[in-house]
Amino acid sequence: MADLVIRGGTIVDGTGAPRRRADVAVDGGRIVAIGDALDGDRELDASGHVVAPGFIDIHTHYDAQVFWDPDLTPSSFHGVTTVVAGNCGFSIAPIRPEGVGILARTLQHVEDMSFDTLSVGVPWDEFETFPQYLEAVARRGTALNYGCYVGHTATRLYVMGEEAYERAATPDELDRMRAVVADAMAGGAIGFASSASPTHNGDQGRPVPSRVATWTSSAI
């Protein structure tokens, strides 16, 4: 007998198959059967409701919000069960303590996030590297599956400081960026994200650091 049966819902399974009425049996946190008259220790009446796989939102900017809204309510309230953050190169790690201000101002300009909220809502003193950021997120937990890219803009600011807004990286700086990204990937980043969009302007209205990079350095 399963732990839970979701009873009588309309199944939309995402395969393109016609919707149908059925029960869903869940055991040990996994779906083990879909059919009729299934038995379970507990039942959830889904009559009149759709039962479907959780949606995956591949483009979010929850990098900071995850700390003050671990339920990620704009997504979880709409059937999303997996989110991807760090898009467009705007992760909030890696980050040096002295770089918090410029990174927060960058996000304020490009993503319309409140500087004050970013300043007090993120535990900046708990992380510097990208793996440390993921550990800080994990300590608090999230309601959804949470994956995050390591960002190009964040990486350039981490290695180059303010000059990331002004020029391309030197060969030595590129080597340091490669090491930072490799560390992030080994520590749980799901990939590397960048942006060359002309709409992405950051601190003081300047093009974000990833736009200043050459295409060669974008493939670090």
Regions found by a protein language model. Name each.
Residues M1-V5, I11-G54:
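Histidine-rich, glycine-flanked metal-binding segment
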Residues G9, V24, G29, G48, ...:
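Divalent metal-coordination and catalytic microenvironments
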Residues D13, D63, F90-P94, A154-L157, ...:
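Flexible loop/turn segments at secondary-structure boundaries
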Residues G48-V50, V150, A196-P198:
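Short, small-residue-rich loop/turn micro-motifs
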Residues V51-P74:
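Di-metal (Zn2+ and/or Mg2+/Mn2+) metal-binding site signature of metallo-dependent hydrolases
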Residues T60-Y62, P123, T170, R211:
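A generic secondary-structure micro-motif detector
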Residues W68-G191:
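Divalent-metal coordination cores built from histidine and acidic residues
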Residues E166-P171, R178-M185, A189-I220:
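Functional cores that coordinate and move charged inorganic groups
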